[in-house]
């Protein structure tokens, strides 16, 4: 590591504590979004289209200096992670869904863009984050009125900057196909979903120093929606 310590990275720590280049906290960013319904077919067949915009307000858990020492400073102990970038961001989003009477009965998707307004007060300009999602629902018309849901999400992050210098490992592209199963019960609807992210390029694709390492991520989610009781 070019310093006297055994490691300048590996410590038992979390975001609650302060460090040499970090302010600790348990709170990350706050997101405020206003949405406008452009078109709504209601219970009939047709389109439902939303548009929205908002603001990301940075949290208190931030890095206070460049953890990559891009200006050529002497390497010293530092932290790379925080819950917030420390920068304000604008949010723009659009959602469009189509309800049909043939399979797939639901088709749709959304696009969300988080665009940094300016650098944080510590000189960090976060990447532009873009998420695009497409989904479809196929009804099975069985006793449970179940459906099979398939989807694909693309997440892209542009290159961030510290004090005007490109941040390593910040640019990335990830594709996440998913499949789910939704069925109805006496008390409500139950949904199970399985998602497999694939990093196309970015920090988890590169392997510096030919290290014997890999990452393999699966995401499983469970949702339960209760029916309200009516007199």
Residue ranges and their predicted role:
Residues 1, 36-38, 55, 94-100, ...:
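Residue-level signature of outer-membrane beta-barrel architecture
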Residues 39-49, 62-64, 101-105, 141-147, ...:
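Short loop/turn motifs that connect adjacent beta-strands in outer-membrane beta-barrel proteins
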Residues 1-49, 57, 76-81, 131, ...:
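Transmembrane beta-barrel domains of Gram-negative outer membranes and organellar outer membranes
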Residues 119-231:
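Outer membrane beta-barrel transmembrane domains
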Residues 7-11, 46, 61-67, 121-123, ...:
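Outer-membrane beta-barrel and related beta-rich outer-membrane complex signature
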Residues 74-85, 117-123:
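Surface-exposed cleft-lining segments at the edges of enzyme active sites
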Residues 1-6, 37, 52-65, 95-101, ...:
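Short glycine-rich beta-strand segments
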Residues 22, 26, 82-88, 97-99, ...:
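Short, contiguous, pocket-lining structural segments
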């Amino acid at each position: 590591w070019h310093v006297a310590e055994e490691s300048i990275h590996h410590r038992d720590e979390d975001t609650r504590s302060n460090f040499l280049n970090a302010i600790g906290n348990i709170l990350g960013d706050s997101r405020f979004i206003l949405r406008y319904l452009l078109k709504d077919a209601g219970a009939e067949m047709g389109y439902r289209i939303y548009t929205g915009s908002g603001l990301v307000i940075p949290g208190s858990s931030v890095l206070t200096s460049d953890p990559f020492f891009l200006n050529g400073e002497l390497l010293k102990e530092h932290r790379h992670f925080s819950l917030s970038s420390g920068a304000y961001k604008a949010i723009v989003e659009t959602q469009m869904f189509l309800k049909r009477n043939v399979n797939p009965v639901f088709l749709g998707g959304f696009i969300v863009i988080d665009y940094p307004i300016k650098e944080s007060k510590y000189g960090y300009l976060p990447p532009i984050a873009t998420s695009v999602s497409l989904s479809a629902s196929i009804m099975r018309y069985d006793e449970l009125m179940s459906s099979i849901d398939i989807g694909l999400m693309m997440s892209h992050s542009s290159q961030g900057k510290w004090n005007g210098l490109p941040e390593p490992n910040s640019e990335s592209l990830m594709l996440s196909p998913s499949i789910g199963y939704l069925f109805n019960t006496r008390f409500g609807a139950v949904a199970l979903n399985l998602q497999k992210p694939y990093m196309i390029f970015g920090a988890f694709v590169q392997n510096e120093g030919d290290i014997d390492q890999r990452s393999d991520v699966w995401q499983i989610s469970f949702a339960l929606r209760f029916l309200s009781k009516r007199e």
